Amino acid sequence: TRCSRDWSSDVCSSDLVFTEILQSGMSDEECFIVHRGKECFVIMNAFPYSSGHILVLPYREVSDVEALTPSEHAELFALVTTGIQVLKTEFKPQGINVGINLGAVAGGSVAQHLHVHVVPRWGGDTNFMVTVAMTKILPEALDVTAARVRARWAQMGGAR
């Protein structure tokens, strides 16, 4: 399983994509993991809506918020909060979306592994190109963005 810069569409379309990434044996840098906690981790979205789009999720595959243990729940939302602070500090967005898509009909593309989207937003960042031509225009490469997020996270006290 590859999870490096050329994110395979086969891997990314897998229902087990996050578990496959964790079990790939590749470095966090190659897999765009920016922080590891005790029960949850933070990874860059391979198909970001905007620069800095992160996903926060438990290591354990669960599909619903109510399936989280109390400690997973606490850490997940603590990491969401830290992620918001990291993105605000590093990218200076005008707003942030935080969301969970529970189930395929709700928009969940990896519905069996709960993950929280934390998306920096700016006025006019409609990303209309995605719907027109399946093209993503971002100001920097994903590995550069991941390095920025990782460094800022460590600087803000979230050492790995």
Positions of PLM-derived features:
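Single conserved hydrophobic/aromatic residue that forms the stacking wall/gate
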Residues: 1-11
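Divalent metal-coordination and catalytic microenvironments
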Residues: 16, 42, 58, 76, ...
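A glycine-rich, hydrophobic loop/mini-helix early in the fold
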Residues: 29-62
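Histidine-centered divalent-metal-coordination microenvironment in nucleic-acid enzymes
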Residues: 53-55, 106-127
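Short histidine-centered catalytic/ligand-binding loop motif
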Residues: 55-77, 133-138
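Long, well-ordered alpha-helical scaffolding segments within enzyme catalytic domains
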Residues: 69-93, 143, 148-152
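A short glycine-rich, hydrophobically flanked beta-strand micro-motif that places a catalytic Asp/Glu
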Residues: 91-104
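Flexible phosphate-binding patches that engage nucleotides and nucleic acids
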Residues: 127-160
